[in-house]
């Protein structure tokens, strides 16, 4: 009986440790995600990098363009985040007549910058 109690206590301790570690890693992941979104926003509004606001209407955008579609409800438009990334990387794959710059194909942005940009745009 005492052996069973010790086993149960050990299992409960292990479960508590694992649960605590998961909660801490979830909080760290959320903080990292928020940081990535902020980095992506800086790229989207940066006049020397992504400069999305030149062609797209976006929240917080000053003097937004209207050449491209407004960047709203992006999770509804792109439920698959990978497809949004592919569109930013090379929009001419989906539409050869696209006026949008192929940011990845032409190496306008690095892969990491594209990831940040996708995180931001997908959050809109």
PLM regions: where:
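Electrostatic cytochrome c docking/interface patches
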Residues: 27-47
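Cys/His-enriched microdomains
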Residues: 50
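C-terminal capping alpha-helices of c-type cytochrome domains
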Residues: 87, 93, 105-124
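N-terminal export/targeting leaders of redox proteins
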Residues: 1-34
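Gly/Gly-Pro-rich "capping" loops immediately C-terminal to redox-active cysteine motifs
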Residues: 37, 45, 53-89, 105
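Extended, non-globular alpha-helical segments
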Residues: 2-13, 83-102
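A general structural signal marking secondary-structure boundaries and capping sites
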Residues: 47, 59, 91-95, 124
